[in-house]
């Protein structure tokens, strides 16, 4: 396969670079997005062809940036389940609700998609040393795919992040740095280190190919819904890469003639006071003045996303919305979804369900709405949030009424 990647286009100044350019960002410093020979793809493949392919994100390989199939670094990522949650739908007040469960990906998160696409393409271009600032799950995914590809990964994260993030990266062979500071400090330090040591800085939005991996989430939703779109997609948003990727993917599907002009409303879900939420409701074109807050959901707390201008553009182009969710609501919803629907969601994923409830109260969604929310990681990555006063029964004792009552209290 020769691939259909045509080039890279700047999201700010519209500069264009040929497809074999090793650029990560535009000369002006802004985000680049991949562009494809869509006319060629239209002649080469149909939705029927895709349906017969293996259930991974690479079933859409014509819409991915790798030139040669032999360059693909994969562990079977993508084509994650769309799980209907009818009890939750009734209780939050929408007609239909699905959870796109990204926790089934390798390393347990949606980050596998971006890592697979980016490392595959960059290695194809001869780039083999990467700097990956993270809050945990991204670094783990890049470490795992880096190990599989045989490339060098350097990852840094705040010391406040759960241990699983850095320990997973370490066991996969990455160089790991824990930073006693904020996410902003991590990005600054890794940017400086990348320039000093000659690493490619692969943070969210700072290279074009992660968008392409994340784009496949939207392609899958459309295919799994019979080449239709839902009314709204609620997405846990940190750097905005997934929002941007899906928006881009829907435009490509329309140009291919595989869907019409309708679009789902893209909804950014962040912690309360999140940068994109603040900018969206203030009518701003980029994020200014947001502050770091400690949170149980670090994946949706980024003070100044690199691609904020593109994420905000995507929300407004789709008549979208932005919702901030307090930690207490995310944690309560995490436990509620476990007990009602059996889904062990991450706090970031649970925040999207809480956001649906808020949007119903505000009149943004209603009883006829068909809604998809994202669980971006398995809740198993957050065992520290599931502590509870469960009874300890002596081996020679009994599970008596008091123990049963304590167990009931522990489950909430």
Over which residues does each language-model region extend?
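PLP-dependent amino-acid enzyme catalytic core
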Residues: 1-412
């Amino acid at each position: 396969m020769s691939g259909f990647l045509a080039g890279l286009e700047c999201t700010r100044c519209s500069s264009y670079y040929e497809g074999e350019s090793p650029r990560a960002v535009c000369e002006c410093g802004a985000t680049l997005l991949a562009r494809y020979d869509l006319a060629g793809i239209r002649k080469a493949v149909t939705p029927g062809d895709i349906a017969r392919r293996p259930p991974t994100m690479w079933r859409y390989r014509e819409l991915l940036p790798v030139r040669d199939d032999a360059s693909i670094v994969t562990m079977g990522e993508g084509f994650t389940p769309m799980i209907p949650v009818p009890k939750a739908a009734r209780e939050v007040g929408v007609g239909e609700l699905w959870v796109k469960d990204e926790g089934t990906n390798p390393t347990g998160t949606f980050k596998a998609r971006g890592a697979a696409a980016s490392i595959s393409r960059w290695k194809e271009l001869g780039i083999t040393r990467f700097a990956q600032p993270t809050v945990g799950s991204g670094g783990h995914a890049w470490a795992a795919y880096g190990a599989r590809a045989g490339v060098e990964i350097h990852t840094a994260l705040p010391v406040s992040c759960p241990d699983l993030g850095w320990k997973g990266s370490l066991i996969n062979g990455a160089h790991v740095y824990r930073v006693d500071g904020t996410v902003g400090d991590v990005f600054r330090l890794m940017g400086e280190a990348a320039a000093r040591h000659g690493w490619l800085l692969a943070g969210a939005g700072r290279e074009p190919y992660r968008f392409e991996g994340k784009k496949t989430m939207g392609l899958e939703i459309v295919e799994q819904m019979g080449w239709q779109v839902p009314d709204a997609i609620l997405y846990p948003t940190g750097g905005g890469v997934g929002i941007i990727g899906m928006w881009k993917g829907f435009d490509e599907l329309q140009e291919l003639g595989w869907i019409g002009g309708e679009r789902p409303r893209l909804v950014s879900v962040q912690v309360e006071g999140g940068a994109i939420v603040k900018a969206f409701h203030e009518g701003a074109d980029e994020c200014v003045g947001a502050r770091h807050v400690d949170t149980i959901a670090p994946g949706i707390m980024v003070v100044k996303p690199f691609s904020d201008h593109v994420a905000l553009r995507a929300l407004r182009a789709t008549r979208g919305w932005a919702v901030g969710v307090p930690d207490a609501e995310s944690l309560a919803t995490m436990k509620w979804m476990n007990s009602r629907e059996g889904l062990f969601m991450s706090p970031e994923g649970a925040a999207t369900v809480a956001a649906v409830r808020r949007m119903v109260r505000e009149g943004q969604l209603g009883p006829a709405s068909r809604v998809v929310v994202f669980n971006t990681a398995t809740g198993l990555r957050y065992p520290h949030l599931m502590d509870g006063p469960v009874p300890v029964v002596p081996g020679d004792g009994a599970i008596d009424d008091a123990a049963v009552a304590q167990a009931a209290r522990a489950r909430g």
